[in-house]
A protein has these predicted regions:
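Membrane-embedded alpha-helical segments of integral membrane proteins
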Residues: 1-42
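Membrane-interface helix-boundary motifs at transmembrane edges
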Residues: 44-52
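Extracytosolic and intramembrane catalytic regions of membrane-associated proteins
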Residues: 98-222
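Internal/C-terminal transmembrane anchor helices
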Residues: 52-73
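Hydrophobic membrane-targeting alpha-helices
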Residues: 37, 41, 45, 68-71
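Short extracytoplasmic
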Residues: 32-37, 88-112
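Alpha-helical transmembrane signal-anchor/signal-peptide segments
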Residues: 71-90
Length: 222
């Protein structure tokens, strides 16, 4: 289960970006610590209700386990969406699927494995652009949450190159030593783009051709 959570559903630095670690630790605490402690508290040899008490504790543990797994699965990042000038991390429970039938087939169903990189399509006319703006301002819904607006990431490479930021800027928002240490691992990285997440914003390193190199645990802004 640990491998599924930290290497498949939440790879790279996405455990920090989404803030799932505390939920997972709480889940482990309930199953590994609280359950056995409750068992010891109710255990009394010869007690008539002992079997019932232990059954209730086991059922509570299983309920907490399944609910925790469900919450982690629903909150996992499924799309890393390039939108205008940044990436946006979209979790499974944040997808707006009311027009999912209008999405391209490859974007109608989120992967059960690692999150996928995609980009958003520009508004086709002024009315659609206004609708997008009002939906985000008034409803808090970004077009990054709408799969019907997704296109392959390579279609946004020209825009990514126009919006890319110099690596030197990262030293304004992070410890200089940390930046140098991380960048030394990825010499092919020539620029970066911000990634907005619900817990901690991250940095996406890209190369000269706007290929994604790595998501790293550096702040892309103040």
């Amino acid at each position: 289960m640990i491998g599924l959570v930290f290497f498949v559903w939440y790879p790279f630095q996405l455990t920090t970006a989404v803030g799932v670690t505390h939920i997972f630790l709480m889940l482990l605490a309930i199953d590994v610590i609280i359950g056995p402690v409750l068992g010891l508290l109710v255990y009394q040899e010869g007690k008539k209700s002992l079997k019932f008490d232990l059954t209730v504790i086991i059922l509570l543990q299983l309920s907490a386990l399944f609910y925790g797994i469900y919450s982690i699965e629903q909150g996992r990042p499924v799309w890393l969406v390039y939108n205008v000038d940044r990436f946006e991390l979209v979790r499974k429970n944040e997808i707006v699927d009311q027009n999912i039938n209008q999405a391209k087939p490859q974007f109608q169903q989120a992967s059960w494995l690692k999150p996928q990189f995609v980009a958003t399509e520009f508004a086709k006319n002024t009315q659609q652009g206004n609708d997008d703006m009002f939906a985000e301002v008034l409803g808090g819904i970004s077009i990054a949450q709408r799969p019907e607006r997704y296109v392959e990431l390579n279609k946004a490479k020209k825009q990514m190159q126009q919006r890319e930021q110099k690596l030197e800027l990262l030293q304004q928002y992070n410890n200089k030593t940390d930046v140098e240490k991380i960048l030394a691992k990825y010499p092919q990285a020539t620029a970066f783009l911000p990634m907005k997440a619900n817990a901690v914003d991250m940095t996406v390193l890209i190369d000269q051709k706007a290929n994604v190199v790595k998501i790293v645990d550096l702040r892309p802004w103040h």
